[in-house]
Amino acid sequence: MNRNILNMKPSGIRRFTALARSTPGCNMLTIGEPDFDTPEPIREAAASAMADGLTHYAPNKGTDSLRAAIAAYETNRGMACTMDNILVTVGATGALNTALTGILNPGEEVIIPIPAFPLYESIVTAAGASSVFLDLKKSNFQIEKAALEAVITPKTRAIVLNSPNNPTGCVLSRESLKTVAELAEKHDFYILCDNVYAALSAEAVPDLTLCRSLRDRVILCQSFSKPWAMTGWRLGWLAAPAELIDKFTLLQAAQIASVPTFLQKAAETALEVPVTDMAAVYRKRREYMLSRLDQMGLTYPRPEGAFYVFPDISRFGMDSETFCIRLIEEGGLAAVPGSCFGGEGHIRLSYCYSDEELRESLDRLERFISNL
């Protein structure tokens, strides 16, 4: 067995979700998956594409028409690019895997600001590289120059930025991004931007892809899953310098060949479907959850995007995993321990649930902590 795989850790998110599902009557606030169905025009486009016979191999990079549509989408959002800068992938997970595997050599290092989505560490480990963690809790979840510079070494190959962030919902400030840009140029490493929540953020998100001087070192990962409620479709993309895309394509060709053709046709339609209505629902749910947490006396970093809140539970005198196990067993509610993200002392709550589910779940949380 590959030693790198033996060093990989199972997903704590999946583990606590499975525990909740095996517990009768347990509610869940664990999953970061839109509760909406994929918009009908997208589903109809997929059915039409199959009926039209678009069921054969697609090019390894993706169809020209989808890559051109994605390039136009990114250009409209501020990242000027052409289809030569785009690779269609199997979701953002595929994009992250291809990008990190494509740039890393064994023994090199990737800086991961934490709390962070645990997948980043898993991919880095599988590639035979090392994760170097930059804890943002003491800096109000922003990146400070001295702290970042302290973890940069000659082995540093990349930094992963996820803004809005999973699990906190926090957005990196322009000052944080300026710091990353300056040090990436000084020390010559890539900036991997996981932007899967940007389209659903409540406020405008500062973005390094707008900085022309960084175009040769910024790699953007994006997904159809979150903005268009297409998690099961497994569609995403990479945007990067053309020479990197060419190399990434060789890697993807060896892994999956290509993304299904009829799904790519439906993805073209998705790019034309507004996400403003779903974003408005998420904002409403966010404000409701925050108001309830305020009433419970729980503090949290202010989320400005994504669909998570990361309340502090350290005052209850137990670690986050113990808290979440007891919450399931005694409170009938599942959350994800902050330790799964490198954020001990917190839990992650998702508001990708109906108003009724949120109300009942937060009632359960309130009853649980009132009895501690």
Task: Walk through the language-model features, giving the residues of each.
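A glycine-/small-polar-enriched, mobile loop at the entrance of the PLP active site in fold-type I
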Residues: N27-D35, S48-R67
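Extreme N-terminal starter segment of soluble prokaryotic enzymes
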Residues: M1-N2
